[in-house]
Amino acid sequence: MRHRKSGVKLGRTGSHRKAMFQNMTNSLFEHELIKTTLPKAKELRRVAEPLITMAKEDSVANRRLAFSRMRSKAMVGKLFGTLGPRYQARPGGYLRIVKCGYRDGDNAPMAYVELVDRD
């Protein structure tokens, strides 16, 4: 039984989901705006927002934990150097999900995921 198990499987194995959200998180932090399906966008929020909260307190332990989740030195550097200080005064809600219609081909609902207060 899967009672009280949070998270959506999205038709993928656990390792595939982990790799997909790792890649999506890196893309989001690099470009600050990505387009994806609505269910993936909602699930990405559960992965990316705790990383930004972690980046608000710069420590070696937090950097190592973020690297274990993202596996990209460049994105960890941007996370702790740019994004953490940017959201220092904001108590959560770092991402905005905007619906943007349906995909041609399979009619999947699409959404933009963007970091709030981006320039």
From Swiss-Prot:
GO terms for molecular function: structural constituent of ribosome. Gene3D superfamilies: Ribosomal protein L17 (3.90.1030.10). GO terms for biological process: translation. One of its GO terms (cellular component) is cytosolic large ribosomal subunit. Keywords: Ribonucleoprotein, Ribosomal protein. The keyword Ribonucleoprotein applies. InterPro entries: Ribosomal_bL17 (IPR000456), Ribosomal_bL17_CS (IPR047859), Ribosomal_bL17_sf (IPR036373). Belongs to the bacterial ribosomal protein bL17 family. Part of the 50S ribosomal subunit. Contacts protein L32. This is Large ribosomal subunit protein bL17. It comes from Psychrobacter arcticus (strain DSM 17307 / VKM B-2377 / 273-4). The lineage of its organism: Bacteria, Pseudomonadati, Pseudomonadota, Gammaproteobacteria, Moraxellales.
